[in-house]
Each structure stands twice: as structure tokens, then as C-alpha cells.
């Protein structure tokens, strides 16, 4: 799920800058033989965007940096495990919108949130550890997200 608000500067058609805020959240549940994962992420970030407006079309690029909250409540060999990785992250996105009416439009967007775990906390079997990857930024500590969304927009 996601939500965003953008304020466009100026009133000329063509290319316009925008400022706003982005929220994006996700939930994943998975099971294997001895493990059950319940992962939730929440991302909040101020945004800067460039919009190319042409008649009823709006093509845009967005970027921002914010904070990603990551929580994993799992069961491993019938014992609870909690992982917390709350980190700074950055996002990039491209999208487009077709304006059906004055206040309504349909849109699609591809977004990427770039985040690495770095050091994080694991609580398992009544003990807590701080974990630090041996090889940072080689992919094993990647908690990034790629998403595609489509929807109906209302313009105030």
C-alpha cells in the first residue's frame, strides 16, 4: 500500500517542479519447514519531483530520502525471533497519469526504495544480539523494495 501528496510549483504547462511526501508500506508472510516469517515495512520520505505536462498527460520522476521501518516477527524451531532494522533509505520513481476529468485521473508508477541493513538487532530465545554484515553492500544486507502501482487519483 502507498500514499503520496505532491504540490506542483507554478501554473504553466510543460515542465514543472513539485514537492511532497511519500508513504509506502508492505507486508510479507512466508513459511518453510521450521520457520515462519511475518515481515512489515513502512517508509516515509519528503519528495522532489519533475513533471512533464502535455494536454491530458502527466509524466513524472520523483526522488527523496527518508526513513524505513523494518520489523520481522518470526518463529524459528518453535521459538520467537524478532528482527528490527530501522534505517535511512532513498527512493526513486517514474510514472504517468492520464487525466480523465478535471479532478480525476488514472495512473501507474514504478518505485524503488534503496536500503541496506547495516547493523541490526535480533532477539531470539530470550537473548538479544547486534548483527553486522561481514560484507556490507554486496547484496546480502539489501532490504530494498521494487514496486509497481496503478490507481485512480483525485486532484484537489
Please provide the spans of the model-predicted regions.
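Conserved alpha-helical elements of sugar-nucleotide-dependent glycosyltransferases
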Residues: 1
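Gram-negative (and chloroplast) outer-membrane scaffold detector with strong preference
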Residues: 4-90, 98-104, 143-156
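Predominantly the C-terminal beta-signal and adjacent terminal strand-loop region
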Residues: 92, 100-156
